[in-house]
Swiss-Prot record:
Stretches assigned to the Globin domain: 2-143
Residues noted as binding heme b in the record, renumbered to the chain: 89
Residues bound to O2: 60
Main function: Involved in oxygen transport from gills to the various peripheral tissues.
A family per Pfam: Globin
InterPro entries associated with the record: Globin, Globin-like_sf, Globin/Proto, Hemoglobin_a-typ, Hemoglobin_oxygen_transport, Hemoglobin_pi
Family affiliation: Belongs to the globin family.
Record-given protein name: Hemoglobin subunit alpha-1
GO molecular function: haptoglobin binding; heme binding; iron ion binding; organic acid binding; oxygen binding; oxygen carrier activity; peroxidase activity
Modified residues (N-acetylserine): 2
SUPFAM superfamilies: Globin-like
Tissue: Red blood cells.
Length: 143
């Protein structure tokens, strides 16, 4: 699914609202992921606490949103812009790429809750397409 110029503008505009609370959004989304899709906990068994508000979840949520921030800056070429993250997730972390879509869904839910006025149907479509592109770019090295 390709992003139109309008989609890219919408993503960047919404990111302007998101960026101030990106760490908390990432933590909330990751916490949701671990509760709603408990099979994803397998990647984090080395953490002492997998509860939604644990320091480990908060820290990794921050890392996730740093990756999303990078993707926003590389929105015109997600594949090459996220190449290093794709390699890390494929070869080092060995994350099943299906989990990228699950996390994307959790992020969308958090955005809808936190930004009810800004998260219009048009913004929802643009962000969904953006996260599909991010998921595809992150899965690139799995092929």
């Amino acid at each position: 699914m390709s992003l139109s110029t309008k989609d890219k503008e919408t993503v960047k505009d919404l990111w302007g609202h998101i960026s101030a609370s990106a760490d908390a959004i990432g933590a909330d989304a990751l916490g949701r992921l671990l509760v709603v899709y408990p099979q994803t906990k397998i990647y984090f068994l080395h953490w002492p606490d997998l509860s939604p508000n644990s320091p480990s979840v908060k820290n990794h949520g921050k890392n996730i949103m740093s990756g999303i921030a990078l993707a926003v800056t590389k929105i015109d070429d997600l594949k090459s812009g996220l190449n290093a993250l794709s390699e890390q997730h494929a070869f080092q972390l060995r994350v099943d790429p299906a989990n990228f879509k699950l996390l994307s869904h959790c992020i969308l839910v958090v955005l809808a809750i936190r930004f009810p006025h800004e998260f219009t149907p048009e913004a929802h479509v643009a962000m969904d397409k953006f996260f599909c592109g991010v998921s595809l770019a992150l899965a690139e090295k799995y092929r």
